[in-house]
């Protein structure tokens, strides 16, 4: 499934080649959970070999735990593809607007692993809708809390 999403996104970006420009993929790393701060720059290097220009927003701090959030989200203004690996962010409105503007553009989006629960605003916060909305409305998959269902095991004698 991930391969299909990536393929379709890259195909959509290939249209930029028709205009003589490299498609620009922007990676937004918004957590250190599962080490995307290491894997996303490697993935960016791989797609550069395929002819993409890449920008990796990957601060030295863990944006999930640091109030500074994510720097240079303005890079999304020139993106042909946005690739998110985020988790439980509480970024301020000045940062969030760059993401929402990109989403309104209708350009392709790919979300990895924890991006279904990319935001974690308090219940009364004006941006609280993004807590479930990013996964559900943008990525097409709601966040299902792991370990929330029953696990059943039956050992068969053999």
Predicted regions, residues:
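Aromatic-Pro/Gly-enriched surface loop or interdomain linker
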Residues: 20-79
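Sec-dependent signal peptide recognition
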Residues: 1-8
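Hydrophobic h-region of N-terminal signal peptides that target proteins for export
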Residues: 9-19
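A generic local structural motif
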Residues: 13, 67-71, 96-97
């Amino acid at each position: 499934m991930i391969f299909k999403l990536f393929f379709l996104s890259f195909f959509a970006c290939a249209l930029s080649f028709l205009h003589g420009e490299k498609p620009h993929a922007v990676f937004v790393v918004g957590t250190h959970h599962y080490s995307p701060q290491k894997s996303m720059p490697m993935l960016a290097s791989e797609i550069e070999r395929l002819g993409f220009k890449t920008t990796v927003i990957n601060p030295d701090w863990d944006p999930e735990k640091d109030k500074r959030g994510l720097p240079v989200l303005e890079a999304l203004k020139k993106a042909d593809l946005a690739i998110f690996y985020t988790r439980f962010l509480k970024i301020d409105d000045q940062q969030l607007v760059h993401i929402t503007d990109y989403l309104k553009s209708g350009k392709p989006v790919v979300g990895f692993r924890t991006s279904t629960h990319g935001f974690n605003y308090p219940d009364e916060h004006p941006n609280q809708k993004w807590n479930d909305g990013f996964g559900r409305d943008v990525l097409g998959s709601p966040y299902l809390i792991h370990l929330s269902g029953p696990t059943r095991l039956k050992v068969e004698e053999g």
